[in-house]
Design a protein with these regions (language model features):
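Outer-membrane beta-barrel porins/channels
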Residues: 1-192
Length: 192
């Protein structure tokens, strides 16, 4: 059994902005370069995350594992220290748009002599307060121990469903996006 906590990450950021304009025309090129550099210092913090995991090992035959992760994405924030209206509005948008979300993972491995059979499942809740997005998937794999090396094969399938509004005004009906992502992985490990 395991419990973990990932603390928020605090960043001290500096944005640097320089602008210039180049205009090309038949009679030549004009460049306006005021040589002004704008520096913008601010702080950004990310959310924390809690994880709970449980695994059961049955002899040398295999294991079953479970993990649940939870994070409150409303805790992401920007700060400049003097009540900047732009950052205050951005923080309000984060709090009204994002929410807490969890991720559930199950997995297992079973050994038959030198052959390892593996399977897993993942289900992620959406972090967007207004959508009913769906992220779920499964994986299957096998590995064979040749003694001096191990060959692993795995297949994973992720199903992602989400809604996106193309425009802020007018045609605001969201479009539905369905993504089926399939990956095949082959790896070989050599024992030294």
């Amino acid at each position: 059994m395991g419990i973990s906590y990932q603390s928020p990450i605090w960043f001290n950021m500096t944005d640097e902005l320089q602008q210039y304009i180049i205009t090309k025309k038949n009679s030549g090129t004009d460049t306006i370069e005021p040589n002004i550099v704008n520096l913008y210092d601010y702080k950004m913090s990310t959310n924390s995350m809690y994880s709970v995991g449980l695994a059961y090992i049955f002899g040398n035959k295999g294991l079953i594992s479970f993990q649940y992760d939870h994070a409150n994405y409303q805790k992401n924030s920007f700060d400049i220290g003097n009540g900047d209206v732009n950052f205050m509005n951005q923080n309000k948008k984060i709090q009204s748009t994002l929410k807490s979300a969890g991720t559930l993972k199950f997995g297992g491995e079973y050994r038959i002599n030198r052959l390892n059979l593996r399977a897993g499942y993942i289900n992620q809740q959406t972090i967007n307060r207004t959508s009913k997005d769906l992220n779920k998937g499964f994986s299957f794999g096998l590995g064979y121990d040749f003694g001096g090396s191990i060959l692993n094969l795995a297949l994973s399938k992720m199903e992602i469903q989400r809604s996106e509004s193309m425009y802020q005004e007018g045609l605001v009906d969201p479009i539905k996006i369905n993504i089926d992502q399939i990956q095949f992985l082959v790896s070989c490990s050599i024992k030294l």
